[in-house]
Every structure is written in C-alpha cells, then in structure tokens.
Amino acid sequence: YRFNVGGGYEKDNLRIENPWRYVESFMNKDGTFDYSKDKYAVKMMKKCLKLGNIDTLIFFANSPHFTQTVTGQTSGGFTEHFSNLDKSKYEDFAKYLIDIAEHFIKEGYPVKYISPINEPQWKWGGESVWQEGCHYEPKEVYDCFLEFAKELEKRKSSLKLYGPESGNIKDHTKEYYKLLSSNELIMKYLDTFAYHSYGSDENVGEKVEFGKWAKKNIKTPRFDMSEWCELPCKHDTKSVESSLIMARIIGEDLIYTGVDSWSAWVCVNQWDNYSDGFLVAKDD
C-alpha cells in the first residue's frame, strides 16, 4: 500500500487549484507535528489494513515539505526542470520524512519503505502546475538518497529506501541506478529499485531490452513497477476495454521486465469519465 506523505501548503502561497491535488502535511510550518492532519487519507489506510491482506506500507513523497523548498510551494520550481528542494535542506527533508514514518511504526503501522522522490525527470513547475512534484537531475537523485541513507544509518533504522520511481523505463532510469549503486551506504538501504511503466504501452521491444538490462544489472533485493495507468485515459476504468489493456500491461511488465510487484494508479479519484481511478469519490 503506497501512502502519500503530503508536503503541506500555505493558502496565500499556493498555485495548485484543485484541492484533490494539494495535501496537508503532518508537519507544521514551525517544525512541530500534528498527526490529526490528512485524516481521511489515514482513515482510508486504516480501513485497508483492517482487511488483513496488506503487510507492507510504502510512504512516498511527491515533494519535500513546503518549508524545505525554494519557492515555499510543493508544486515545483518557478521554472521547468529545476529542483525545488533547497540545497541546504536535504538533511531536513530526510529527518522530516523518516520522523513521520517512524511515528506510524510506533503506532503499529507496517511501514517498511520510504520513497522520497517521485518521477524525478519530469518538469514539475514552470507556469503550469497541477499537483505536488519536484524535479531532480540524476546527481540530485543521488545526493538525496545519500542523505536519507546517512540519516537511516545514524538512527540504525529498520526502514529501507524505495525508488527513485522514474516516470518511465527510458530517459535517465539506467543512469539513476548506475549512480545509486555506486555508493555502498545507499545500497545498504536501497531495498527496492522502482520505476513507473509509462510511455511503453505499445512498445514491447523497449520492455524486453529494459528487462534484459535489469536482469544483468539490478542487484537490489526487490525490483518493482510501482505505478501505471492508461495515459491518456481513452477508456474508463470500469470498462472491459480498460481491463484488457491493464491485464496486457501487467503481463508484459511481469514477463518482459521481470518485476517483483506491480501497482496501479490510482485507487480513488474525483472523475467519472475516462478516469484513472478504480473508485469515484465526490466532494459531497
């Protein structure tokens, strides 16, 4: 179960218009914590855990906390392809996300992984923003994971790192792994190398090639495909056409890329038509 740790916001410094796309943070602006925040997401997580078939929680962040960003926002920089994580805040970001995960562990939640980065290659920012996100260049991905590994080592934590959840199998995905795997401390805590299977729905050859590379090179205990939906959503998720497409993609990713697990995006959203959500929830 992937749980999104929101980066928070200030109403007078917020460019994301859709309230479904900005998320309360458990950390206040002054650095104190309030775990009554984002209560409905926590409530949904609790309900799912009560079903008894979930043994692993992955806490992932689309953005650092808004106080740790250059813009004071979680929707990316004011220019495209610019990392919004303040260079002086890498350690703060690691402490913040690990603190939250450890709080839930103490409360009895089976948090096994933290994923600090989501789809680092995308532009995340500029004039048009729509959700939380943060761009990272490959070296910045490395620097971020190293800071998290250092903090986990300092705490002798049982938590493991997950990621970097590249947006596809192309672009910098292989470079991310090459950089991360070059550091012994990172690899001590990077239990799962994860990517998203976007952009190759009609190109099995790309998946075959990537799978061969992964089998030869990836040495982490797990290798996951952590997010996919049909993009663009030409079929509603309630339709048989959508089901057949998803079944094909699941099969291709398991067989050709050799992943250990496969996750869909997303369980619930607000749209009825051509939705990527399995369930629809309305504001009322």
Predicted regions and their residues:
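Short acidic/His/Gly/Ser-rich catalytic and metal-binding motifs that mark active-site loops
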Residues: 10-13, 65-78, 120-127, 171-173, ...
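Active-site neighborhood of glycoside hydrolase catalytic domains
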Residues: 91-113, 120-234, 244-247
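Aromatic/acidic polysaccharide-binding cleft in carbohydrate-active enzymes
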Residues: 222-284
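N-terminal catalytic cores of secreted or lumenal carbohydrate-active enzymes
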Residues: 1-112, 116, 132-137, 142, ...
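Short secondary-structure boundary/capping segments
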Residues: 15-22, 72-78, 129-133, 176-180, ...
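Noncatalytic linker/hinge segments flanking ATPase motor cores
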Residues: 45-48, 100-103, 204-208, 235, ...
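A general structural signal for short secondary-structure junctions and capping/turn motifs
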Residues: 47-51, 214-216, 251-256
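Structural recognition of the beta-strand scaffold that forms the well-ordered cores
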Residues: 1-5, 56-60, 112-116, 160-163, ...
